[in-house]
């Protein structure tokens, strides 16, 4: 069984809340701050933050104060490949990569929903993100059995 996450921006706390789909029935919601979009380097993972949550299929970095490596890596990679062709990047997001303005929560939410989650689900490009996590993330997954996919259809 693979983990499947949905995300919501909490504008009051300026954090990206992540939780497994169907967490309400299991009583296991969790949230964590997203951190910087353009930083591809994984940060240290807090040993106690979220340690009580054992969510199948999630890497340990899902509970990091900087957010999951999957989102950080994916965001950074997307920006790096499109920053020179900024017509493909929303204007506020392009400015954010240059440090010129603050991105609104609406634009950030649209970016994640449209660019990262919706397109990959509908177009069947989940393998790209799976490889990014398993190949690019230095953190071990919570579950040992393979395959453990971070964002995949169950």
From Swiss-Prot:
Keyword set includes Transmembrane: no
InterPro entries in alphabetical order: Transactivation_prot_X
Major subcellular location class: host cell
Domain of life: Viruses
Region (Mitochondrial targeting sequence): 68-117
Keywords: Activation of host NF-kappa-B by virus, Activator, Apoptosis, Host cytoplasm, Host G2/M cell cycle arrest by virus, Host mitochondrion, Host nucleus, Host-virus interaction, Modulation of host cell cycle by virus, Transcription, Transcription regulation
Processing after translation: A fraction may be phosphorylated in insect cells and HepG2 cells, a human hepatoblastoma cell line. Phosphorylated in vitro by host protein kinase C or mitogen-activated protein kinase. N-acetylated in insect cells.
Subcellular localization: Host cytoplasm; Host nucleus; Host mitochondrion
Biological-process GO terms, alphabetical: DNA-templated transcription; symbiont-mediated activation of host NF-kappaB cascade; symbiont-mediated arrest of host cell cycle during G2/M transition; viral genome replication
GO CC field: host cell mitochondrion; host cell nucleus
Entry's family note: Belongs to the orthohepadnavirus protein X family.
Chain's role: Multifunctional protein that plays a role in silencing host antiviral defenses and promoting viral transcription. Does not seem to be essential for HBV infection. May be directly involved in development of cirrhosis and liver cancer (hepatocellular carcinoma). Most of cytosolic activities involve modulation of cytosolic calcium. The effect on apoptosis is controversial depending on the cell types in which the studies have been conducted. May induce apoptosis by localizing in mitochondria and causing loss of mitochondrial membrane potential.
Subunit structure: May form homodimer. May interact with host CEBPA, CFLAR, CREB1, DDB1, E4F1, HBXIP, HSPD1/HSP60, NFKBIA, POLR2E and SMAD4. Interacts with host SMC5-SMC6 complex and induces its degradation. Interacts with host TRPC4AP; leading to prevent ubiquitination of TRPC4AP. Interacts with host PLSCR1; this interaction promotes ubiquitination and degradation of HBx and impairs HBx-mediated cell proliferation.
Protein's name according to its UniProt entry: Protein X
Species lineage: Viruses, Riboviria, Pararnavirae, Artverviricota, Revtraviricetes
Gene name of this polypeptide: X
